[in-house]
Amino acid sequence: MDWSTHEKDSMDAIEFASGWRAVFAEAGLATVDDFMRYEGGTPIGHNRHRQVLTFVLDTPGGPRRFYMKRFIRPHLKDMLATLRRFRRPCSQAECEWRYARTLLAQGIETYHPVCHGSLMRYGFEQGSFFVTEEIQGQCLTDYIAETWKNLSAEDRRMLLVSLGRFVRRVHEAGISFPDLYAWHIYLLDPVGPSSPLALIDLHRMRCGVKRLGERLRNLGALEYSLLERYFDDDAKRILFEAYRRPEDRLSWEDFRSRVLRRADVLRQRRRHAPDY
């Protein structure tokens, strides 16, 4: 998408969380076009369909770091998925904005949304962006890679139980999270085995889901992302036993079989195995 060919939208086309509009206007970010063409900051990830960058702006409280996800070539299947979920055209950025607010309303931590905007044509998304505040914490996989070998057995157990109970709380809120990979989970400051946890990368999240099969598919994604160099069978049993609910009426063997089956599907689909 060549954003230079589009007329600038009015500032009202962008939805801001309270208190942020003037901060971004001062930095020259006032329209959808401004955000989509912004070249400041540091890119931290991209593929054919989206880009992620981080940048710092001056605010009344001092410099603040933000993250922006830009959906530059929205995938048709994702546009159709949001249409089914919301029963109206909805950009990928608005979808993630709404899901972040839903999680926070349920008491489940995630990045705090700042603003979003989109360019729609005939009900189809041409591109969109979503800006969040920086999460004060550390990605779970980074924490594991740096500290796992030095954690005591009790601290490891504490972290595993916390993780299992966190995922159970997400599911008990009726939320399905297909991308429940360890790298989409954060430990909040002060970082440690008992830290509160948070989710990121929300655009495939779904609400109002209670089906056991879908919850087990989520857990299969988590299983896939747990590297054997850190998580042996005993560690995984601690985690998943902390998650399990008596009302699901599944034996441990049936539960593990279904989770592992989904993890195997993901391994076959991925070109590269996870590493951290």
Enumerate the predicted regions with their spans.
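C-lobe/activation-segment region of protein kinase-like
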Residues: 194-272
